[in-house]
Amino acid sequence: MQINKESRELLEKVMTRLHNSIKNPWETQMEPYQVVPNVFYVGNKYVGSYLLKTDAGIILIDATLQETAYLLIESIRKLGFDPQKIKKLLISHGHIDHCGAARLIQEYTGCEIYFPQGDAFFLTDRRDLLLGDVPDFKVTGNYDYNSQMDFGNIRIKPVHTPGHTPGCTSFLISVDIGIEKLLLGMHGGMGLNGLSLAELEQNHLPASLQKDYEKSLKEISK
């Protein structure tokens, strides 16, 4: 996988804007909205987060940054939900913009947190790969890629899609709407940042992640 100059410049702009969201989080605010019945977008302009209203309670996918957590909580309230009733937080991968607010949310709600096993070493001996200061949080469990998580009216099938990170996880979400069933897909991390050979070598990660990324795109499309 070759990353040309134009792509690299675009990636640098994306990362600059993301880092600016830590300094000025209010600039990332956007209105929450319903994706389909019982599935809502509650993230911001740069980092996604999804709220699922299930028979088993509120499920949240990705925590966003600690600095933007107040925007996340405000978005949940705007939709008429109580953020303290979040039961489970599913984290797609171990970067600060997806798990930075995990500790805050866990302390605020008492929720369980699920985290990809392939990124578990980010939380221990390779905290530099988190790409920032992420407060410690308690991991309840890892994903079983051979089964789905059943929440009654909504079922989530985690799919291992390595590349962006070794443990990057995507979610296939099956939603019951009356007698109909909808299938939604959320890719856990399509960013090319970190995937150049120079960056992989610098981060002491295997070059095979490039091929893993290509394979993961095919896997999620099945």
What is each PLM-predicted segment?
Residues M15, Q34, A56-I58, K87, ...:
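A short, structure-level motif marking secondary-structure boundaries and short turns
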Residues M1-Q29:
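N-terminal pre-domain segments of enzymes
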Residues Y41, I59-D62, K88-I91, P158-H160:
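Short catalytic-loop micro-motif centered on adjacent basic/acidic residues
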Residues V14, H19-N20, Q29, Q34-V36, I58, L65-E67, Q148-F151, R155-K222, ...:
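Metallo-beta-lactamase
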